[in-house]
Amino acid sequence: MCNKLEQVFSQLANAEISNKDNVYTIVVAKENLRQAAETLRNNDIVRFDFLRDIIGMDYTDSLGVIYNLSPSEDLSVIVLLESRTDDRENPAFDTVEDLWLSAPFYEREVHDFFGIRFLGNPDMRRIFLRQDWRGYPLRKDYDSSPIINPIPLENEDLDALEYLPVLDLKDIDKERKSVFDKGDFVVNFGPQHPATHGVLHLRVSLDGEVIKKVDPNFGYIHRGIEKICEVSMYHQILHLADRLDYLSGSINRHAVCMAIEKGIQLEVPPRAQYVRTIIDELTRIASHLLGWGAMAMDMGAITAFVYGMRDREKIMKIFEKTCGGRLMANYSMIGGLMEDIHPDFQKDIKEFVVYMRKMLREHHILFTGNPIARGRMEGVGHLTREQAISIGATGPVGRASGWQCDVRKIEPYAAYDKAEFTAVLREGGMTFDRYYIRLDEIEESLKIIEQLVDNIPEGPFCAKPKPIVKLPEGEYIQRVENARGDFSVYINSRGDKFPYRVKFRSPSMVLVNVLKHIAPGNKIADLIMLGGSLDYVIPCIDR
């Protein structure tokens, strides 16, 4: 692979290339950015067809962007494509929205928070903040005075969302075209609707009962978590990570801990590694049970939801005994675990594994084999493997389309290399495949837990870091496999006790982008079911 990468990198014009911990950093001038992106995406040697994220940066004297890229055939390879501009008044880069289907949302996010324009992107509306918001919050010189942005007393006018502005260097505010075609019948779905699974606003245009277009609107519970991280010490960031995807809180927290531990070169005791892995897999099972039950309830099967919550409650009780918390376990900390496991931890888990295997069979009998439910799910909401990669759909959604993207297999962390399990794949890419694969993953999680729970090493449960943690200057990336896919943490440190920049990669944001692509052509009655099959979590998107 190294020789192939060298061949690809040799095609880049005037690029500075470095490698640290198998992460390649490529720095190019802004006039060469588009050519570099095209080369990485379209070359015939190693195609970087997976755009994991676009990270906006304020370097004080300049503004920049970082494209986090990997080839879908070898996700262990990470390339950070960086570029900067000294023009803080009118910062602009060429768009890459035609190269990756994930790019439009990412570019809108960078524009929203940094004011960077992406020339050629036809939709440069703000994506989290109101369209009338003044300033760019993640810039270092941002003025947060409430006088500039007072608390609004009225809802945002929907007309503000209707027009797509052209963002070039000459005429910034010119209205280019409407989101929908003239005469379209548009339905507002959410943000206060139980089937959106959170405060998500979807504007849906219809031709009769058939969906023509879906326009998602985020930000109703945007909390500025990445901005808060910049004024928080590293141990404080852990509590913010829990509150992104709250159904994968322990897994997200694990990712932040590993990023920090990697930076300060702190070795975590084996006992903590095993317990972290078990907690992560219990969290995954709990999330999948809730996702399974919620999707079934969206389709009218309330009994399935009740059964899913009943089974999930057993996991919550295990968490409560050992961690003290339920949904927010607050268990992993820098160096290991907050406390050692409860004396009943292993006994309770072994009982749960036996119970859950029996219940999985019951769940399949109850709902999977139901001919009405199966008839609604099969042949609906097709997502091809190529689309999944270009949109960046990882986790169960990506694997249901035949893409092997499980971080636990690609880059084993904690104690995953001590357990044998299968990263389940399905080839259909339909709603039924996305439904079924989560039940399969519960079985694989039970296998992992079963292999580890009787082999938890003796010894300390935590390695004690310094009271005030300071990461050495540099960039740190850590990714984990949470219940919805590749959750990545990017930390840029200047050697201080506060991070200079923190970026969380939201797998749920990508899943709403999937909905935007698979919903057209389906009936409006199936929109709720399609969203349920994707299992996105809104606080993870809004951050």
Put a short name on every predicted segment:
Residues M1-V210, G369, A373-V380, Q387, ...:
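Terminal low-complexity/charged segments
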